[in-house]
From Swiss-Prot:
Residues 1-42, 134-185, 223-275, 290-414, 465-509 are annotated as: Disordered. It comes from Dictyostelium discoideum. This is Probable basic-leucine zipper transcription factor H. Probable transcriptional regulator. One of its GO terms (cellular component) is nucleus. Residues 50-113 form the bZIP domain. Residues 78-99 are annotated as: Leucine-zipper. Residues 10-39, 226-248, 255-269, 292-350, 361-414, 465-483, 490-509 have a biased composition (Low complexity). PROSITE patterns: BZIP, BZIP_BASIC.
């Protein structure tokens, strides 16, 4: 085709037919070749697209398969969860059924227990009614028994008990030893004497009266003393009575006004520290009060912290020793008088000589009879001696000298001390207080202070009716009254003053 213009140019514008034919033929051939190549290109494009579609389809299939597999897995998991939930639900249903059954059983048990409680209450009511019936039936028997016991107890009146004790004392007076003439008798065997007297009181009690483990030994002494006083009352009615005011007691020395009674037996000069043969009056100021010592042997004696000996009795009786008060008179203390009395008045004097002689004779007869069984006189343990020689008492006899409606004995004393002495030393001091001055009991006071039953520092101070002409002075007296001081090795007796209690000390050395 490149040569055709040259031919045209060369031929000066004339067209060569051969060249035109050749050009057309070349054009058709080129056209056919281009269309064939396009078809082949389209076929190739279609194949690629088909391949892509196939790949996409394969991917979709794979993803669907994976999805299905995942779905199956999820479904299986959900199925297991559902199965678990169903099993849990079934278990809960079973538990609810069991709880319902247990609730029903508990309800039945509660009903049974309520029935049992009701039956038990009914039985209790029945038993109460039976007991009330039995008690109502037994009350007449108890009343009859109590009446019989009261009759039996009423048979043991104070007079009868006095007679029993006096019979025992008269029977035992023939079996006593002669320790009254010896100088070391008395307190050396004081515990045996107390035991024998307690046994005498127990043996003299009535069979219908129950006995106690610790009987009151002051009781028998009191009853026997009452009978002795009944015998001596005709001789003592004309003797003057002493009304003495109480004086408070303290552990420390107190300034007490000393009044020395004028007695013919008091002008004896002491030639030794403790002369046994001197006939002088000794009385004791006892800080211990005895309350309600009854006529039976059922008294429980105890010493409280304030120095009082309280006795609580089991049975009622008509003979009591009343308490020692602060507002009543003090009988039997020769060295202490009321402020209204004179120091040398006749009412301030000691016991009559006839009373002392009778008392000493009775004690010597009881102690001389039997040396193997040492006993103490029933009057040795009396607390206080009145000026007539005995305790100020109202007996239960038919005499008209009764000053108290319930036949009680009024022992009056002032009690302000808080010390509580032992019982052994207390009873021994009581025996010394009621015994005469020439008794061998006084000679053994030193033995009392060293005895195992004696508590050192106890209350054991004598009031000595000494002569006013003595020249010894104590710091505890206001008016510088004469006195003498005795000391023992364990502190038994603190002070023996002329007519007064000078001081109460613990352990003098």
């Amino acid at each position: 085709m490149m040569n055709s213009p040259r031919s045209l140019d060369s031929s000066d514008g004339s067209v060569d037919s051969s060249s035109v034919y050749s050009g057309t033929s070349s054009f058709g051939s080129s056209f056919t070749s281009s269309t064939g190549s396009g078809f082949t290109n389209s076929m190739l494009f279609d194949d690629e697209e088909a391949k892509k579609k196939k790949i996409r389809q394969m991917q979709n299939r794979q993803s669907a398969a994976q999805y299905r597999e995942r779905k199956k897995e999820y479904l299986e998991k959900l199925e297991t969860i559902v199965d678990n939930l169903e099993s849990d639900r079934n278990q809960l249903l079973q538990q609810t059924k069991q709880l319902g059954m247990l609730q029903n059983e508990n309800y039945l048990k509660i009903n049974q227990l309520e029935e049992q409680i009701e039956s038990a209450l009914r039985e209790n009511n029945d038993l109460k009614s039976r007991l009330s019936d039995l008690l109502s039936k037994q009350q007449p028997h108890d009343n009859s028994n109590s009446n019989s016991n009261s009759n039996n107890n009423s048979n043991v009146s104070p007079n009868n008990s006095i007679n029993i004790l006096n019979n025992n004392n008269s029977s035992s007076s023939n079996n006593n030893n002669n320790n009254s003439n010896s100088n070391n008798g008395g307190i050396g065997s004081f515990s045996n004497i107390l035991n024998n007297n307690i046994n005498n009181n127990i043996s003299s009690s009535s069979p219908s009266t129950p006995s106690c483990s610790s009987p009151s030994f002051l009781e028998g002494r009191h009853f026997s003393h009452l009978q002795q006083q009944q015998q001596q009352q005709p001789q003592q009615q004309n003797s003057p009575q002493i009304l003495q005011s109480p004086i408070p007691l303290q552990h420390s020395p107190l300034p007490i006004q000393q009044i020395s009674p004028s007695s013919p037996n008091q002008n004896i000069n002491r030639r030794s520290r403790f002369n046994i043969g001197e006939s002088r009056e000794r009385s004791i100021l006892n800080p211990i009060s005895i309350e309600n010592v009854n006529n039976n042997n059922n008294n429980n004696i105890k010493l409280n912290g304030s120095g009082d000996m309280d006795t609580s009795s089991d049975n009622n009786s008509s003979m009591n020793i009343n308490s020692i008060n602060n507002s009543s008179n003090l009988n039997g203390f020769n060295g202490l008088s009321s402020p209204n009395q004179q120091p040398n008045s006749p009412s301030n004097r000691s016991q009559p000589k006839r009373q002392r002689d009778l008392f000493l004779q009775q004690q010597q007869q009881q102690q001389h009879s039997d040396p193997s069984s040492p006993n103490i006189s029933s009057n040795n343990l009396l607390l206080l001696n009145n000026p007539n020689g005995g305790i100020n008492s109202n007996n239960n006899s038919n005499s008209n000298n009764s000053n108290n409606s319930n036949n009680s004995n009024n022992i009056i004393n002032n009690n302000n001390t808080s010390y509580t002495p032992p019982l052994a030393s207390f009873t021994s001091i009581l025996s010394i207080a009621s015994s005469p001055s020439s008794s061998p009991v006084i000679s053994s006071l030193a033995q009392l202070s060293s005895s195992p039953n004696y508590n050192s520092g106890g209350f054991s101070s004598f009031i000595d009716s000494n002569n006013n002409n003595s020249n010894n002075n104590n710091s505890g007296l206001e008016n510088n009254s004469p006195s003498r001081r005795y000391k023992f090795h364990n502190g038994g007796i603190n002070n023996i003053s002329s007519g007064n209690l000078n001081s109460l000390k613990g352990i003098p050395k």
